[in-house]
């Protein structure tokens, strides 16, 4: 095996310094790239994902985690590419075009709800998150019902 360029590194060491290596220690969202049901996990302990996962670090990451895990978040990603077996392919490129409004007034509330959901994992907290996200998108009761039924039916068919 021949190196691409001359370095003092051994063959198994990276030859190029990656500029984003510090992001692995920041609060982030980690998710599996391929799957039938979407789950976005919040990490603030510096965990690392496997090679089949993606991660995103940055501002308002708890807020984003709530939106992506909501019924509306799942609905926004419904048109992501799929595998031959129908599983979703949700890479960073699939999430970037999603229109996610940022409303600062919900930032602290969603952060608190995420903490509560992580520690307790209740349906009531999940509903509260979904309701806030529906309000952020300005959905009518009929639109909320449509999104809810669509996501639940698609999850049942998986």
Identify the meaning behind each predicted range.
Residues 1-108:
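Polybasic, glycine- and aromatic-enriched phosphate-binding surface used to engage nucleic acids
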Residues 102-158:
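Non-catalytic DNA-recognition/assembly elements of restriction-modification systems
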């Amino acid at each position: 095996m021949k190196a691409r360029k001359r370095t003092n590194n051994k063959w198994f060491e990276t030859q190029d310094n990656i500029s984003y290596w510090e992001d692995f220690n920041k609060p982030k969202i980690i998710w599996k790239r391929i799957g039938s049901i979407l789950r976005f996990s919040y990490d603030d302990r510096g965990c690392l994902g496997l090679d089949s996962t993606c991660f995103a670090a940055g501002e308002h990451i708890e807020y984003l985690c709530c939106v992506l895990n909501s019924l509306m978040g799942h609905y926004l990603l419904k048109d992501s590419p799929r595998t031959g077996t129908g599983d979703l392919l949700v890479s960073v490129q699939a999430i970037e075009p999603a229109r996610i409004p940022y409303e600062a007034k919900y930032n602290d509330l969603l952060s608190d709800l995420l903490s509560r959901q992580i520690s307790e994992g209740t349906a009531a907290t999940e509903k509260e998150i979904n309701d806030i996200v529906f309000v952020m998108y300005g959905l009518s009761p009929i639109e909320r019902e449509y999104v809810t039924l669509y996501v639940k039916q698609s999850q049942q068919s998986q």
